[in-house]
């Protein structure tokens, strides 16, 4: 299944706020109206919608998300918590959380077009897994910095999470540590996502 490129407002109207996909917000009460029209949700649908929220927020294909779930399942600790850490430490998401892009698709475009350096080297893989002490900067070129400055000049969409530090005058971000679950940028019940996939196998 390919990455979603359709109308973004349609998704947030059904699933709620997805800040990684769009800065727009669903109108208040739209979720309640949708729920009243559709009646009581089944447990399957509840788990499916949580999975879809995760997929659309981080801009993943179904295959990519399944791969992350499998990696998280083999790691020590809570599968759901590890899954969120893996997704939050992706380079495209780190750029978004630093405020260097207004959405995760926008951040992915910066990476694909080779505007971003990690520890002084160009990285053009949006799924690159960032680590503590990684330094994220832009190329020292006018066009690269102008693109980032456009995002920095726009109203900030959220507070900078504590696992990151950003120096706007230098266009430089620092990964201080692995993200704590309370700083994840999406309201999500990750256990329902894990349950969804466990019932598919």
Swiss-Prot record:
SMART domains hit by this protein: Ribosomal_S4, S4
Annotated GO CC locations: chloroplast; small ribosomal subunit
MF GO annotations: rRNA binding; structural constituent of ribosome
Superkingdom of origin: Eukaryota
Coiled coil: none
Pfam family, one: Ribosomal_S4
Annotated segments matching region Disordered: 15-44
Keyword list, A-Z: Chloroplast, Plastid, Ribonucleoprotein, Ribosomal protein, RNA-binding, rRNA-binding
Similarity field: Belongs to the universal ribosomal protein uS4 family.
Cited function: One of the primary rRNA binding proteins, it binds directly to 16S rRNA where it nucleates assembly of the body of the 30S subunit.
Name assigned to this protein: Small ribosomal subunit protein uS4c
Originating gene: rps4
